[in-house]
């Protein structure tokens, strides 16, 4: 199974109804697969990536259900930082899928790679504003990574989690299957203290 197909099937399995994001050269390997599952997962493309992150944050606030964002390499992913920071501050579960350069081109500067301190280092940009950042570099790493990422978004205090996926991981194939869903979902958030509400 291709990495992109695995991710699309994962979104279906986890009942992720929307992916908010913008198509780009870095994430093209996931776009066809999202088209194949379009009846279960809708890709909505706003005009700017920051808007995508705010849409995902707002969706969780209203529905208490995590959704995903999808961005391409370099500036495309950099544009989601403020929206993801807002989601972290306000405890909104968001699965931030960011694309990165192909692993075989790490540290060569393609596709606007961020590599001044570490190879393919976009995860360091989001680390201060996510609960955790993952970067699977092979398709066989995706099942565990995706399972841990979605569970972490909703466990404990909800918040955004990043999965940074190199370009070739969307395209390459491996003999892997999805891990079963744990169904860690909450349909409501804790209510405020009634006494504090009366005071307000």
Placement of each model-derived feature along the sequence:
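N-terminal alpha/beta PP-like core and its mobile active-site loop of ThDP/TPP-dependent enzymes
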Residues: 1-200
């Amino acid at each position: 199974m291709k990495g992109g197909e695995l991710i699309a099937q994962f979104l279906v399995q986890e009942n992720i109804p929307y992916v908010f994001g913008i198509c780009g050269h870095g994430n093209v390997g996931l776009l066809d697969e999202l088209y194949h599952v379009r009846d279960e997962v809708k890709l909505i493309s706003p005009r700017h990536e920051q808007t995508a992150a705010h849409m995902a944050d707002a969706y969780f606030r209203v529905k208490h259900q995590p959704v995903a964002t999808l961005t391409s390499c370099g500036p495309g992913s950099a544009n989601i930082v403020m929206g993801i920071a807002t989601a972290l501050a306000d405890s909104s579960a968001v699965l931030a899928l960011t694309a990165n350069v192909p692993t075989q081109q790490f540290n060569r500067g393609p596709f606007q790679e961020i590599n001044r301190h570490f190879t393919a280092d976009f995860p360091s940009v989001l680390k201060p504003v996510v609960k955790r950042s993952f970067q699977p570099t092979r398709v066989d790493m995706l099942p565990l990574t995706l399972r841990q990422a979605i569970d972490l978004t909703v466990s404990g205090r909800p918040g955004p989690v990043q999965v940074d996926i190199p370009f070739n991981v969307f395209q390459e194939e491996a003999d892997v299957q999805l891990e079963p869903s744990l169904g860690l979902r909450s349909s409501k958030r804790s209510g405020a203290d009634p006494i504090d509400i009366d005071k307000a």
